[in-house]
Swiss-Prot record:
Costimulates T-cell proliferation. May regulate myeloid cell activity in a variety of tissues. Coiled coil: none annotated. Residues 260-278 are cytoplasmic. This is OX-2 membrane glycoprotein. Residues 1-30 form the signal peptide.
Amino acid sequence: MGSPVFRRPFCHLSTYSLLWAIAAVALSTAQVEVVTQDERKLLHTTASLRCSLKTTQEPLIVTWQKKKAVGPENMVTYSKAHGVVIQPTYKDRINITELGLLNTSITFWNTTLDDEGCYMCLFNMFGSGKVSGTACLTLYVQPIVHLHYNYFEDHLNITCSATARPAPAISWKGTGSGIENSTESHSHSNGTTSVTSILRVKDPKTQVGKEVICQVLYLGNVIDYKQSLDKGFWFSVPLLLSIVSLVILLVLISILLYWKRHRNQERGESSQGMQRMK
């Protein structure tokens, strides 16, 4: 009679080994850290994004992808076997400027609005799959500010406009009573936004010699733009009509006097001629 064969412990041993292997892979993956840093750069300049893999195990390949609504888009890869491979869409626009498998950087030669967004760096690790990090690029345009004022018939307009990316905010300092404020914004195709704020002063004479400050809030900083109000020209419609009427009257009187004088001279000359003929 043959002795029985026990297979159950072997199954348990295989299961335990598999579990230990999975745990080891998970532990090694969990210990891998990807360090990234978001960047804010001036539009139409050079910008770089960097990823660092904190591990002693060197990955096989590094891939950079751009995050999009429809899914990530491959941009460029680097490996020791194939070097740098740039996708056709991104040729002449970007390159990997730090050739490494643990530290990698991509550089945009001349940033455009399409380059703004978030990017993933993927490290393909042997035995533990892919490890990724995300770095975001934000583009800005420095504000261009204009501050001026105009006098009208019965009020004064003080206008402050700022154009920038992202959109700036405008506030006023040094204003008094009897002043109305209106603000509007307009987006441009180049990615900038213009914000215009107008102060309407009902009694301009009260603001002569005073300093008005337009405060532009941009990226957490407040910049003051100052304007001193000089004496302007105030007039009303009745006063203007009176002045014009007076000028017209003076012109008519001058014409009438000139005509009378010229007529008297002609009469005098004709009477003298008749006396000589006699």
